Amino acid sequence: MKPDETPMFDPSLLKEVDWSQNTATFSPAISPTHPGEGLVLRPLCTADLNRGFFKVLGQLTETGVVSPEQFMKSFEHMKKSGDYYVTVVEDVTLGQIVATATLIIEHKFIHSCAKRGRVEDVVVSDECRGKQLGKLLLSTLTLLSKKLNCYKITLECLPQNVGFYKKFGYTVSEENYMCRRFLK
């Protein structure tokens, strides 16, 4: 299988979010359908492997060495599950991914078999910080989780980022986030 433009999920979902429910302020105004000059907000596709997707992710955390085969296998798994919404912003003039964030849907038995959204891996490339792309991705994925009928959406962040996420209606939970790592 060769990298192509097939999206991980239906791109119309991003256009159908109810932007009137957005709680963040954008100046200048941007939206999922108008993210800025030369920019497109869309689902990840396998061709993004060659558009700097891992370069951007690497600005957030260690990505490790990922072969094209590994990438394709993970992409197909996520696509088939229907519960992964890896979203990117592409600078179409450069043909490069400049920002990404992921919404993952968890299916629960609680709350009448409800769904919970979880935001992961929000990162904007160094060159594009200050263009509100992180805000745009977070607002879009938050509204998408509502459209997908999630009963709540959560995320984990560093203490210095709490203020940023509060702008979108997120609150600090009384629960503790705990982790046990198996890989360093």
Curated annotation (Swiss-Prot):
Q: Which reaction does it catalyse?
A: D-glucosamine 6-phosphate + acetyl-CoA = N-acetyl-D-glucosamine 6-phosphate + CoA + H(+)
Q: Please state where this protein is localized.
A: Golgi apparatus membrane; Endosome membrane
Annotated Gene Ontology cellular components are:
cytosol; endoplasmic reticulum-Golgi intermediate compartment; endosome membrane; Golgi membrane; late endosome
Annotated membrane topology: Peripheral membrane protein
Q: Where does acetyl-CoA bind?
A: 130-135, 165-167
| GO term, biological process aspect, one | UDP-N-acetylglucosamine biosynthetic process
Subcellular location, principal: Golgi
Q: What is the effect of changing residue 156 to A?
A: Reduces affinity for glucosamine-6-phosphate 6-fold
- Where substrate binds, per the record, is at 61, 108-111, 120-122, 151-152, 175, 181
Give this protein's Gene Ontology molecular function annotations. glucosamine 6-phosphate N-acetyltransferase activity; identical protein binding
Which stretches make up the N-acetyltransferase domain? 39-184
State the Pfam families in the record: Acetyltransf_1 (PF00583)
- Which key words tag this protein in UniProt? Acyltransferase, Disease variant, Dwarfism, Endosome, Golgi apparatus, Membrane, Transferase
- InterPro entries from the entry? Acyl_CoA_acyltransferase, GNAT_dom, GNPNAT1-like
| Pathway(s) of this molecule | Nucleotide-sugar biosynthesis; UDP-N-acetyl-alpha-D-glucosamine biosynthesis; N-acetyl-alpha-D-glucosamine 1-phosphate from alpha-D-glucosamine 6-phosphate (route I): step 1/2
Protein family per UniProt: Belongs to the acetyltransferase family. GNA1 subfamily.
The protein's name in its UniProt record:
Glucosamine 6-phosphate N-acetyltransferase
UniProt source species:
Homo sapiens
Q: What is the lineage of its organism?
A: Eukaryota, Metazoa, Chordata, Craniata, Vertebrata
